[in-house]
Amino acid sequence: MILALPIFYLSILTIFLLILNWLIFQQLKTILLLESQFKYFVDKSQNRKLEPDESFAFAKVCVAKKYFSKAIIEGQLALKNYRDLNILDNNIVIANLYNMLGFIYFEAGQTSFAKNFYEQALQINPNYVVALNNLAKIYEEVKDLKKAESLYDKVLTLNLNNKTANRRKDFIAKTKNI
């Protein structure tokens, strides 16, 4: 009976430490993968010009590492290269690139540039739900709640189950009622 309580506490501590160890290991694995991808793209870009899809992937890695200036450069390069290819399915990729560049500028705190890129993505694909959500978020940031709400309404007409649009629209409605 006397040994049962310490054994119980040690068991709980061991389980907690095992879970913590697993979480740290997963985080380290993610960091090492990101670093190896970044090193791969840096080495490859120094030796030769990256393909458009490689520039796009490199820009995504740079965003994950919060290297926004490098991500903007690579994103612009990928955009230029995709425009030069003249492939029919390019419009979807170009809209994705515009949206990604908008996201990068938004994360860097430059909302006016971000807004322009989101609008360009929507000119190419007016039903691009992610770009609509992102543009609505910018309108929320600048306190233009009517435009934000109308964009969220458009998102919900395209995708009724969009959690982001539902949540943000409810938030705007609560904000208006205060």
Curated annotation (Swiss-Prot):
Subcellular location(s) per record: Plastid, Chloroplast
TPR repeat copies, ranges: 52-89, 95-128, 129-162
Keyword Repeat: yes
Coiled-coil features, chain-numbered ranges: none
PROSITE patterns registered for this protein in UniProt: TPR (PS50005), TPR_REGION (PS50293)
The organism's place on the tree of life at top rank: Eukaryota
Keyword NAD on entry: no
Gene Ontology, cellular component aspect: chloroplast
UniProt keyword terms in alphabetical order: Chloroplast, Plastid, Repeat, TPR repeat
Family: Belongs to the ycf37 family.
Protein name (record): Uncharacterized protein ycf37
